[in-house]
Amino acid sequence: MYIGVISMRYAKALLAYADEKGTEDTVYEEAGILADSFSRIPELRQALDNPVLPAETKLKLICEAAGGGKVSEELKRFVELVLEERREKFLQFMIMSYIDLYRKQKNISVGKITTVCPVAEEVVNRIRALVVEKTHGTVEFKTKIDPKLEGGFIFEIGTYRLDASVANQIKRVKQQFIAKNRRIV
């Protein structure tokens, strides 16, 4: 079976189970923390792939990574099922699929603002209001600091990207000079 098929089946099952219990929001928060742990700590994935570690140890590891040991009963039971079925190597993909399914169900868009210096909360809230108005859903924002931009910002949401950075403007001017003169300036 393909990774995507397996992870999507388990993610749909987790979403249905969490919906039934009314804890889909809590599971979503824990899944976000766990997904972040997978990306920040590559050893976590290696530990899950290790056949020598017992399932109880893997369960404790995952619970610790998902919220300091205080995870919801639904997520804990889901992880127990995954470990029982020996599908732990797909767990990261299952969690990412759950996050995607939850966002689709709740109409949540994820936006990213990249700037040279930290952005004031007031500016983020104004951008959030504009995006909510256009998408008719909620928006989660991530901010990133990148000194290579030299000024301006890059805003991304879904497949849309608005690059208003100074670095991009300099690049476009340089391309125009090259196109006109047929030589590098």
UniProtKB/Swiss-Prot annotation:
* InterPro entries on file: ATP_synth_OSCP/delta_N_sf, ATPase_OSCP/dsu
The protein's UniProt keywords, in alphabetical order, are: ATP synthesis, Cell inner membrane, Cell membrane, CF(1), Hydrogen ion transport, Ion transport, Membrane, Transport
Instruction: List the GO molecular function terms.
Output: proton-transporting ATP synthase activity, rotational mechanism
Main localization category: membrane
Q: Which Pfam families match?
A: OSCP
Q: Does the keyword Membrane apply?
A: yes
Gene Ontology CC: one annotated term: plasma membrane
Show the coiled coil region(s): none
Matching entries from Gene3D superfamilies are given as:
N-terminal domain of the delta subunit of the F1F0-ATP synthase
The residue ranges crossing the membrane are none
Q: Where is the protein situated, by its record's location annotation?
A: Cell inner membrane
Q: How does it sit in the membrane?
A: Peripheral membrane protein
UniProt function note: F(1)F(0) ATP synthase produces ATP from ADP in the presence of a proton or sodium gradient. F-type ATPases consist of two structural domains, F(1) containing the extramembraneous catalytic core and F(0) containing the membrane proton channel, linked together by a central stalk and a peripheral stalk. During catalysis, ATP synthesis in the catalytic domain of F(1) is coupled via a rotary mechanism of the central stalk subunits to proton translocation. This protein is part of the stalk that links CF(0) to CF(1). It either transmits conformational changes from CF(0) to CF(1) or is implicated in proton conduction.
HAMAP family annotated for this entry?
ATP_synth_delta_bact
Give the similarity note. Answer: Belongs to the ATPase delta chain family.
- Assembly and oligomerization: F-type ATPases have 2 components, F(1) - the catalytic core - and F(0) - the membrane proton channel. F(1) has five subunits: alpha(3), beta(3), gamma(1), delta(1), epsilon(1). F(0) has three main subunits: a(1), b(2) and c(10-14). The alpha and beta chains form an alternating ring which encloses part of the gamma chain. F(1) is attached to F(0) by a central stalk formed by the gamma and epsilon chains, while a peripheral stalk is formed by the delta and b chains.
- Full protein name: ATP synthase subunit delta
Protein's organism: Phocaeicola vulgatus (strain ATCC 8482 / DSM 1447 / JCM 5826 / CCUG 4940 / NBRC 14291 / NCTC 11154) (Bacteroides vulgatus)
Taxonomic path: Bacteria, Pseudomonadati, Bacteroidota, Bacteroidia, Bacteroidales
Q: Gene that codes for this?
A: atpH
